[in-house]
């Protein structure tokens, strides 16, 4: 199925590895020109090279999405190198340390907010005006099932993920009349995170399908939401959980 986005410029944050990399590869397969942003500049360049080796067009950029000046610098470079940004996938996120509220360190709370929420805001703010002016844009933010359900020991992480859902819905309202959509993805347990700790192993047992998801499960949904075929979908929250959010006996 042709998604109708060949030649579009797609910016993907946190795309040096894992889920973000899968997002970038899926969009590249649809013919998008890809800007790979990551705090790990070398990893971003490696992902870009992999796309180029497969016949696509991509550039890698080191970027700290917590810093507005750095975001502005990189977005300017992307538009110089590849063209105006049509698609923005806010994948970058902080892999939290599980801690109950009574034990949480203030710096962990601040880091969750800075990466998961402020970073999403800064990147989106940088590309949104151009999308609005050109009357076409697709924005996806990475939430989590934790943002919808909460989680024991996940106060900081879940708070930021619910926050980006509210952000996505508000941006969707602002962009609607300009053909700029904004949607949120709420993944459940996605490999390789499921292998990080015994906590994830226990959580997989709550999944109705009794298995973890793969990065491609999320990336394929994101590619669709970024396409011409999803032009009437905005302000939505799409759980990709294998039924983790369902009540099972």
Question: Regions from the language model: what does each represent?
Answer:
Residues 144:
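Residue(s) in the substrate-gating loop at a strand-loop-helix junction
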Residues 2, 95-98, 149, 223, ...:
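Short C-terminal tail/terminal secondary-structure segment
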Residues 99-101, 105-113, 203:
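Substrate-binding pocket helix/loop in short-chain dehydrogenase/reductase
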Residues 41-42, 62-74, 106, 216-217:
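The beta1-alpha1 cofactor-binding region of Rossmann-like NAD(H)/NADP(H)-dependent oxidoreductases
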Residues 129, 173-174, 231:
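Alpha-helical segment proximal to the catalytic Tyr-Lys
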Residues 176, 181, 233-235:
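Short, small/polar-rich loop/turn modules that mediate ligand/substrate recognition or access, typified
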């Amino acid at each position: 199925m042709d998604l109708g986005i060949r030649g579009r410029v797609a910016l993907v944050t946190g795309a040096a590895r894992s889920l973000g990399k899968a997002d970038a590869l899926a969009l590249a397969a649809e013919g998008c020109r890809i800007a790979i942003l990551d705090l790990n500049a070398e990893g971003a360049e490696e992902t870009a090279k992999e796309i180029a080796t497969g016949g696509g067009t991509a550039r890698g950029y080191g970027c700290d999405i917590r810093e507005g000046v750095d975001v502005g610098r990189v977005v300017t470079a992307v538009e110089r190198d590849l063209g105006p940004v049509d698609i923005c996938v806010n994948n970058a996120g902080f892999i939290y340390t599980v801690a109950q509220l009574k034990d949480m360190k203030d710096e962990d709370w601040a880091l969750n907010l800075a990466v998961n929420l402020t970073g999403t805001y800064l990147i989106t703010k940088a590309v949104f005006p151009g999308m609005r002016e050109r009357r076409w844009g697709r924005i996806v933010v990475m939430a989590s099932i934790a943002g919808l359900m909460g989680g024991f020991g996940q106060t900081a992480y879940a708070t930021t993920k619910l926050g980006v859902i509210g952000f996505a819905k508000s941006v969707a309202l602002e962009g609607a009349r300009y053909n700029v959509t904004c949607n949120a993805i709420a993944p459940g347990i996605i490999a390789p995170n499921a292998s990080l700790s015994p906590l994830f192993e226990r959580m997989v047992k709550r999944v109705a399908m009794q298995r973890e998801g793969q990065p491609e499960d999320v990336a394929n949904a994101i590619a669709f939401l970024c396409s011409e075929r999803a032009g009437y979908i905005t302000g939505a929250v799409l759980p990709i959980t294998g039924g983790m959010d369902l009540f099972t006996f």
